Amino acid sequence: MARLVFGMNQSLDGYVDHLAFGPGPELFRHFIEEAQGQAGSVYGRQMYEVMRYWDDDHPEWDAEEHAFAAAWRNQPKWVVSRSLKSVGPNARLVEDDLEGAIRELKAERDGEIEVAGPDLAQSLTELGLIDEYRIYLHPVVLGHGKPYFAGPRPPLRLLANDRIGEDVIRLTYVPA
């Protein structure tokens, strides 16, 4: 049975914003390794559209960006959306019955399946489907934006904390 994991970069004041700050080299390598080992990813529409950047090679990319793109392209993706009519390669659209589709996905697969995007994660949290939360805490303060938890924070228990690179702490929580 697969485990659903929600992990995102977060500011010290609890916000996520991929445009305001991003991973440094060590954290990016960590994300490459994670992507290479994942059984797949579940995206909301907005995050999926952001990630489509990795569909096409870009001449300015270095070897690590090519490695991440390859890992992203190779893994199966499920895109939760009522407005999209089609999705790209290696992706399947989930339009109805979110709970049933994700329960089926977890039952059919093994390994880790990433959940991407705070709004989708909130819906899956409310359904009791997320098995682990990974907060990649960065030393920045945004003051506004989209919070990591898009709704009430669920009761959580700290499982682990570790440093990645010079300035990022990964906090790993499971539902309490």
Language-model region placement:
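Enzymes that bind and transform nitrogen-containing heteroaromatic metabolites
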Residues: 1-176
